[in-house]
Amino acid sequence: MIRRSILIPAPSHMEARPAVFLDRDGTLTRYAGFVLEPSQLRLESGSVESIVRLRAAGFAVVVVTNQSAIGRGMMTEAQLADVHRELLWQLDAADALIDAIYYCPECPTESNETVVESNDRKPGPGMLLQAADELHLDLAQSWMIGDRMSDVLAGINAGCRGSVRVRTGLEPPSAPATSASDIETVENIVAATDVVLGECGHQAA
C-alpha cells in the first residue's frame, strides 16, 4: 500500500526527466527513531542546499519513506500528514522545493531489511515506480539516496542509474543481498549530491 502526501504534477507534454529519490529519516532529516509529531522533525545539515542544487541541475526531487509507525499503531495517517506539513514548511521557508512525498505505512515482518516483503515497502521499488508513472520520470537517469540498505536496494530494484548511501542515519542490521562494492557510501546528503552531480557532468559546489 502506497500513500502520497504531496504531488506537483508534471505537464503531460514534458519529456521524461531524471529524479533524485531521497529517504526521509536519517537522510533528509535527522534520525530520531519514530518521528510521531512535528516537533520531533529536524532537517539534516545540508538538506536545503542539496535540494536546491539538484533542482538547479534539472532533477525532480522526490521523498520516498517507509513509515511503519502507522502499521504498528503508533500514529495515524493524519498525524503523519502533520509531520509532512512541518517538513514542507521548513523546506519551503528556505526555497527548497520537492515534487512529492510517497510513503508506505506497512509494518515489516522480516528482520532482514534487504528482503523484498512487499513491492510497496523499500527495498521494494513500488514507491519509485509509482512516482515515475505519476511524475513522468526517467528511472534510468535517476538516483536514490538513503542511509539504509533498504533505501539503496530500492533504487537498484527500480532500475535507477545509481544509489548512494549516507552515514547520517541508523546502521542497518544485516548484510546486503548485492555486492557492497556496487554501492558508494559517503558522509551525508551534501556528499551524495556531489556524487550525483559529478556523475552527471555537473560541477560540484
Residue ranges of model-derived segments:
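Acidic, Mg2+-coordinating phosphoryl-transfer loop and its flanking beta/alpha structural elements
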Residues: 145-184
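Basic, amphipathic juxtamembrane/active-site segments
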Residues: 32-49
